[in-house]
A protein has these predicted regions:
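Catalytic-core signature of thiol
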Residues: 1-171
C-alpha cells in the first residue's frame, strides 16, 4: 500500500514534528476523501494548538482534533511555516476540512487498514538513534516514543515506509 503525499518541508530547529505529522495525515485523509492534494499550514498548529507546546513539542492526536474543530484550515501559503514559535494569527484559511474523526490504532493490523483505506496515518516512533541513519531498513524496537512521522506505505517485505520532517538531506 502506498499513499500520495504533498512535498515535505524540513521542520528545521523547531521541534514541530508533531505538527508536520498531524497535518500530513489530514492532507492524506482529505486526498482519500476525494479532494485534490493540498499543502496545509503546520505553523497554524505550532502557534495556535492549545494542547501542544509549539517548537517544544506536541501531540499528533490533540493537533488533529484541534484541526477538525476549526473546520476551515489555512493553506501553507496563507500561514507559512517559520520554524519558530509565534503568536496565533486569526488567519482562518480557505480550505474546508472534510475529515471529521481521529482514530488511534490499537494494532499494526489496524494501522495497515487505516493506511489502505483512510490515508497515510500519523505515527510516533523512537528516533533517538536516527541521526546516523542513511538508508535501508531501520529496526525500531523501543517504546520510548519521541518523534512524529507519517506512515506512507509498506514495502514488499512488510516494512513500514515513513515520511520524516527532517528535510531531503536526511535518510
Amino acid at each position: 500500500a502506498w499513499m500520495v503525499a504533498s512535498q515535505s518541508s524540513p521542520e528545521a530547529s523547531c521541534g514541530s514534528c508533531w505538527a508536520f505529522s498531524a497535518v500530513e495525515a489530514v492532507e492524506s485523509a482529505e486526498n482519500v476523501n476525494g479532494n485534490k492534494l493540498v499543502d496545509l499550514s503546520e505553523q497554524k498548529l505550532v502557534d495556535c494548538d492549545p494542547g501542544s507546546y509549539g517548537c517544544d513539542g506536541g501531540f499528533m492526536d490533540t493537533a488533529v482534533k484541534y484541526m477538525i474543530a476549526q473546520k476551515v484550515w489555512p493553506l501553507e501559503k496563507e500561514y507559512a511555516y517559520t520554524a519558530r514559535d509565534g503568536s496565533c494569527k486569526t488567519t482562518k484559511g480557505s480550505f474546508t476540512l472534510t475529515v471529521n474523526a481521529y482514530k488511534t490504532p490499537s494494532s499494526t493490523k489496524t494501522l495497515t487498514t487505516i493506511l489502505e483505506s483512510e490515508g497515510a496515518p500519523s505515527v510516533a516512533v523512537d528516533a533517538s538513534d536516527w541521526s546516523s541513519y542513511t538508508s535501508g531498513v531501520h529496526s525500531c524496537r523501543s517504546k520510548d516514543l519521541n518523534h512524529g512521522v507519517q506512515a506512507v506505505g509498506i514495502d514488499d517485505n512488510g516494512n513500514w515506509v515513513i515520511r520524516n520532517s527532517w528535510g531531503t538531506r536526511w535518510g
